[in-house]
Amino acid sequence: MQPLSPAFIDQLCFDDIGLIPAISQDWLDGAVLMMAWMNRTALEQTLKSGQVHYWSRSRQELWHKGATSGHTQILKGIRYDCDADVLLLSIEQTGLVSCHTGARSCFFAEVNQHSQGDSLTLPPPMDACSELFRVIDQRHTTPEANSYTNKLLEGGDNRILKKIGEESAEFVMACKDDDEKAIANEAADLLFHLQVALAHHGVNWRDVLEVLANRRGAPRRN
């Protein structure tokens, strides 16, 4: 990432004690990871070092995230909201652990509307393709009876690649027919089977996202 100018800091609206909330988000799959506070010093140190620093309200000191645990956050980008009083940090989370509990995200509890204040422990919200791969990979490591995904994985390359060929042909035909609904459906089927192939070969969906992210803005090949 190119160094960011600290000039924008003067446009931010810090609260009465000089703090601003900062939400960190995974730079690849968009998962919301944690929320903490920054003051001007923390933000300036973040920009200078390229690693995220917060302000600890309990300890009243600068907090270099992950300095002790090793789970540092590498800054990829910063946005602020329309009122300039909340920061959104795009970060690469070292070790994929941002919460002190050992969870990937601090936002792992969702209130169950059918319960009385109980919560369910869930993975962080992320984009649909990343969530789909998470489920596929879970089937890969923890098979479930009568699972279509597991039947594909058990069939190996022969079964998986045959389905990719079939779904590719169906996608092409949908495009030839210019049927928007069919194109969307066939694209979804094709993406699913591509992800099954990735899981079968031990390639993480994040690896694909990282390739795409790194290609963004890169010189085009002839």
From Swiss-Prot:
<feature type="region of interest" description="Phosphoribosyl-ATP pyrophosphohydrolase">
    <location>
        <begin position="129"/>
        <end position="222"/>
    </location>
</feature>
<dbReference type="Pfam" id="PF01502">
    <property type="entry name" value="PRA-CH"/>
</dbReference>
<dbReference type="InterPro" id="IPR038019">
    <property type="entry name" value="PRib_AMP_CycHydrolase_sf"/>
</dbReference>
<comment type="similarity">
    <text>In the N-terminal section; belongs to the PRA-CH family.</text>
</comment>
<dbReference type="GO" id="GO:0004635">
    <property type="term" value="F:phosphoribosyl-AMP cyclohydrolase activity"/>
</dbReference>
<dbReference type="GO" id="GO:0005737">
    <property type="term" value="C:cytoplasm"/>
</dbReference>
<comment type="pathway">
    <text>Amino-acid biosynthesis; L-histidine biosynthesis; L-histidine from 5-phospho-alpha-D-ribose 1-diphosphate: step 3/9.</text>
</comment>
<dbReference type="Pfam" id="PF01503">
    <property type="entry name" value="PRA-PH"/>
</dbReference>
<dbReference type="InterPro" id="IPR023019">
    <property type="entry name" value="His_synth_HisIE"/>
</dbReference>
<keyword id="KW-0368">Histidine biosynthesis</keyword>
<dbReference type="InterPro" id="IPR026660">
    <property type="entry name" value="PRA-CH"/>
</dbReference>
<dbReference type="GO" id="GO:0004636">
    <property type="term" value="F:phosphoribosyl-ATP diphosphatase activity"/>
</dbReference>
<comment type="similarity">
    <text>In the C-terminal section; belongs to the PRA-PH family.</text>
</comment>
<keyword id="KW-0067">ATP-binding</keyword>
<dbReference type="InterPro" id="IPR021130">
    <property type="entry name" value="PRib-ATP_PPHydrolase-like"/>
</dbReference>
<keyword id="KW-0511">Multifunctional enzyme</keyword>
<protein>
    <recommendedName>
        <fullName>Histidine biosynthesis bifunctional protein HisIE</fullName>
        <ecNumber>3.5.4.19</ecNumber>
        <ecNumber>3.6.1.31</ecNumber>
    </recommendedName>
</protein>
<keyword id="KW-0028">Amino-acid biosynthesis</keyword>
<feature type="region of interest" description="Phosphoribosyl-AMP cyclohydrolase">
    <location>
        <begin position="1"/>
        <end position="128"/>
    </location>
</feature>
<dbReference type="GO" id="GO:0005524">
    <property type="term" value="F:ATP binding"/>
</dbReference>
<dbReference type="InterPro" id="IPR008179">
    <property type="entry name" value="HisE"/>
</dbReference>
<keyword id="KW-0378">Hydrolase</keyword>
<comment type="pathway">
    <text>Amino-acid biosynthesis; L-histidine biosynthesis; L-histidine from 5-phospho-alpha-D-ribose 1-diphosphate: step 2/9.</text>
</comment>
<dbReference type="GO" id="GO:0000105">
    <property type="term" value="P:L-histidine biosynthetic process"/>
</dbReference>
<dbReference type="InterPro" id="IPR002496">
    <property type="entry name" value="PRib_AMP_CycHydrolase_dom"/>
</dbReference>
<keyword id="KW-0547">Nucleotide-binding</keyword>
<keyword id="KW-0963">Cytoplasm</keyword>
